[in-house]
Regions:
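Non-cysteine beta-strand/loop elements that form the S-adenosyl-L-methionine
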Residues: 23, 81-91
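Surface-exposed, active-site-proximal loop segments in enzymatic domains
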Residues: 91-104
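Active-site-proximal loop/turn and secondary-structure-junction residues that shape catalytic pockets
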Residues: 27, 62, 89-91, 132
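Glycine-rich, positively charged N-terminal anion/phosphate-binding segment
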Residues: 3-78
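A structural signal for short coil/turn segments at secondary-structure junctions
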Residues: 78-79, 121
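Hydrophobic "anchor" residues on beta-strands that sit immediately upstream
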Residues: 20, 82, 125
Length: 132
């Protein structure tokens, strides 16, 4: 969850017995574009975690298979325990751009995204968050 599951929140969750935690969801486009230093919180800083948080998943969202592939490659280099693709966020500024739950309306595009992420994840498991 954006602006919720940051490092302090994840640490508290682990201390209270959470089996697994996830990063805030990371915008693949923003990560690929590498915004200026003052905007880094929107991208690569969200990939930071401590070993004490493990197991931990990095959650990515985006509509383009190309940006998702690049973002997944970057995420995999951080060595999380898994990569999660967000196909469940219904917030309009995400879904109306074809990301999050917006991918559920385009199964062929969703498949491309998932295949590209799996292709660069290596041995890391890849999961997909959806909504029914």
């Amino acid at each position: 969850m954006e602006d919720v599951s940051d490092l302090p929140f994840r640490t508290i969750c682990k201390e209270l017995g959470a089996d697994i935690v996830y990063t805030e969801f990371v915008n693949a486009e923003g990560l690929v574009r590498q915004p200026p230093v003052e905007h880094r919180r929107r991208g690569s800083d969200k990939l930071l975690f401590r070993d004490a948080e493990r197991p931990l998943g990095i959650q990515l969202y985006g509509a383009s298979e190309f940006s998702m592939e690049t973002a997944a490659h970057t995420a995999a280099q951080r060595r999380p325990d898994l990569i999660d693709i967000n196909c469940g966020c219904w917030v309009s500024n995400v879904a109306l751009r074809g990301a999050g739950a917006g991918l559920l309306k385009e199964p062929a595009q969703m498949r491309k995204v998932v295949e590209r992420v799996i292709g660069v994840a290596g041995e890391l498991p890849v999961t997909v968050k959806t909504r029914l």
